Design a protein with these regions (language model features):
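NAD(P)-dinucleotide binding in Rossmann-like oxidoreductases
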Residues: 146, 157-251
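Rossmann-like dinucleotide-binding domain that binds NAD(P)(H)
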Residues: 81-164, 171-174, 275
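Beta-strand-loop-alpha-helix segment that lines the small-molecule cofactor/substrate pocket
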Residues: 1-30, 44, 294
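Active-site rim elements
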Residues: 24-26, 70, 105-112, 140-145, ...
Length: 308
């Protein structure tokens, strides 16, 4: 959505002032799979949200944005100055044009390319529409040492209220896209084509192993009393619920576009307006700022600025 947090705030203000329909393009919010996972989450299946883990990895040149520039691209057929816009001026370079995500002067790295999809999907499922209050990040350029200045390994930890959200992104090892939402009543694990829910009871199912240090008589008394108090009646024992949902092959980009067109026609709300998109992008900007500053950063909602 934006190259900086200030860009995002300007888009939000422009959308509000113009009263135009604006749909931000992170298409996870139009995913049928995530909509089904949201139903499970909203049912209270995992209980209070305690923590979230998000991860994704690539391991190929194209995935690391080493795109080939168009053959014959030259200043004679390409308006380089207009393409640069407000970015620092530099001589025409077809590599910079093709691989713009690699440099902070033009792009936002793995955070803006990949993290935003994970974060917006998590926000959609969990019903979050705010930027994280704090963020810390680490990583580095460890695989693709091609002159880029954006990290190809980027780890971040966010705080959404009391909920920590851990994000792992790498361009050096292929790993499946994964979202884990964890609560005291269960785990909801969302992958690219399916999700799994497994319930948890959150109680001891046997006497504590700590009693191994008790004298024999005390241990016997403790274990006898424990079983009297906790053992279920016959046929009443806890059975963990499990659910695996596999959706059909599904492209969430087309319905995301359709949702926008329907909103233009009917004036109904879109699934991802400028405010939601700005909040998702803010997390990515915070991850980048924390990485480059090597320090904790915070979000000031009143001014839409990153501090640290």
């Amino acid at each position: 959505m934006s190259h900086t947090a200030a860009d995002g705030a300007a888009i939000v203000a422009a959308a509000k002032k113009s009263e135009r329909i604006v749909q931000i393009g992170s298409q996870r919010t139009s995913s049928a799979l995530l909509a089904k996972a949201k139903q499970v989450y909203d049912s209270g299946a995992i209980g209070e949200l305690l923590s979230v883990e998000l991860s994704l990895g690539r391991n190929d040149p194209t995935g690391a944005w080493e795109y080939p520039p168009p053959p014959g691209l030259a200043p004679e057929n390409f308006d380089w100055d207009t393409w640069l816009g407000t970015a620092p001026k530099k001589p025409f370079d077809p590599i910079t044009y093709a691989r713009w995500r690699c440099w902070k002067e033009y792009g936002t790295g793995v955070a803006g390319d990949l993290m935003v999809h994970l974060v917006s999907g998590m926000m959609f499922v969990a019903g979050i529409n705010q930027a994280p209050s704090r963020a810390f990040a680490t990583g580095g350029i460890v695989r693709w040492k091609d002159g880029r200045n954006m990290p190809d390994l980027h780890y971040a930890i966010f705080e959404y209220g009391q909920v920590p959200v851990y994000v792992r992104l790498t361009l050096g090892t292929e790993t499946a896209e994964m979202t884990r939402l964890m609560g005291p009543k269960g785990l909801l694990e969302i992958r690219e084509r399916d999700f799994t829910y497994i319930s948890q009871r959150g109680i001891d199912v046997a006497p504590s192993y700590y009693d191994q240090g008790f004298p024999t008589a005390m241990r016997h008394t403790y274990e006898t009393d424990w079983h009297k108090e906790h053992d279920p009646a016959p046929g009443k024992g806890f059975v963990s619920d499990a659910m695996v949902y596999t959706g059909p092959s599904y492209d969430d980009l087309a319905p995301h576009m359709w949702n926008f067109l329907e909103a233009v026609r009917t004036r109904k709300p879109v699934v991802q307006d400028a405010v939601f998109g700005h909040h998702a992008a803010a997390a990515c900007h915070m991850a980048n700022q924390a990485y480059f500053r090597k320090s904790l950063v915070t979000w000031d909602e009143s001014t839409s600025t990153i501090r640290g």
